[in-house]
């Protein structure tokens, strides 16, 4: 089948459909995922085609949803859980941290936990608090979890396939503001490893590293910088835990500068760990300190202040200017 251009949300839908078709043990669970097709219609049509026993509408109880998924995984199923919005995941945090993430190690490797938790996250859609947060660092800190975030339709499709096939739990963060961005998806492609980062734009003067919704912004920054004669490399991290530090290191050894960009607050965000590791690995290559651009260390603001809170072209370009000034 030839490649098809589709929105990121549609790519996830098609990937879930493929998984349901190929493995009767795959189940989808969550609030309004069935009859409604999800708040963002990511699961649209799946309950109609596969039935209520495989695409399951649940009560509004995130802890119960994840706990049920853990039980199903113990019985050999591969549940895919949808948390309706990023800020709704916290009632399930206990189940995720104390049970889901630890079951494999607790059993000395005998018990597998093939559970995927889908979390639409981030801002940019004018929503209120609890609907626009970026809690990925809270999960990346937990050993036993894989944490990923696609930035485009092709990765959304294939990373979902790989997440469902994983015998370890995967937290799959979906960038809401990119749901309707379209790109080519080749259903017959051979994807790289789930954890592998990718250089999506080559450059020589500075590296921008990002994941999920900020990759597109970094590409726009690189376009703007090119108009001033600056050559920026953009690395799509794809995986937040584990991080493909080797790819980032190779880029930084070439460009000698790094700016990490994410929507989550800069304080103790994923960028802090990346900055620390790259400083340790590339100390003698760096021409400037590693800089970070992210949200502020404050509760997510009302929608009318969202644009002031989130990283934008000017804030990232300012970091680029500061780095290149050294």
Tell me the role of every PLM-derived stretch:
Residues 1-173, 308, ...:
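Thiamine diphosphate
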């Amino acid at each position: 089948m030839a490649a098809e251009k589709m929105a990121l949300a549609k790519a996830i839908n098609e990937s879930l459909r493929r998984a349901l078709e190929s493995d009767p043990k795959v189940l989808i669970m969550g609030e309004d995922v069935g009859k409604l097709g999800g708040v963002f219609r990511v699961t649209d049509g799946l309950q109609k085609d596969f039935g209520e026993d495989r695409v399951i509408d649940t009560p509004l109880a995130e802890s119960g949803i994840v706990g049920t998924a853990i039980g199903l995984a113990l019985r050999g199923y591969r549940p895919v859980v949808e948390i309706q919005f990023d800020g709704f995941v916290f009632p399930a945090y206990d189940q995720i941290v104390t049970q889901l993430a630890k079951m494999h190690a607790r059993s000395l490797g005998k018990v597998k936990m093939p559970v995927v938790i889908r979390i639409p996250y981030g801002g940019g859609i004018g929503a209120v608090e609890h609907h626009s947060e970026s809690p990925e660092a809270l999960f990346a800190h937990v050993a036993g979890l894989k944490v990923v975030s696609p930035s485009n339709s092709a990765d959304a499709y294939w990373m979902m396939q790989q997440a469902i096939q994983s015998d370890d739990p995967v937290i799959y963060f979906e960038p809401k503001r990119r749901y309707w961005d379209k790109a080519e998806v080749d259903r017959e492609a051979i994807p790289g490893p789930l954890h592998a980062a990718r250089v999506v734009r080559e450059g020589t003067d500075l590296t921008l590293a990002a994941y999920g919704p900020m990759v597109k912004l970094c590409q726009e920054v690189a376009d703007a910088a090119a108009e001033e004669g600056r050559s920026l490399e953009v690395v799509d991290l794809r995986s937040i835990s584990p991080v493909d530090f080797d790819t980032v290191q190779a880029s930084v050894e070439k460009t000698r500068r790094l700016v990490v960009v994410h929507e989550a607050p800069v304080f103790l965000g994923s960028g802090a760990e990346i900055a620390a590791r790259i400083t340790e690995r590339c100390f003698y290559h760096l021409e400037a300190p590693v800089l970070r651009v992210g949200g502020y260390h404050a509760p997510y603001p009302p929608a009318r202040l969202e644009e002031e809170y989130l990283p934008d072209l000017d804030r990232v370009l300012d970091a680029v200017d500061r780095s290149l000034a050294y």
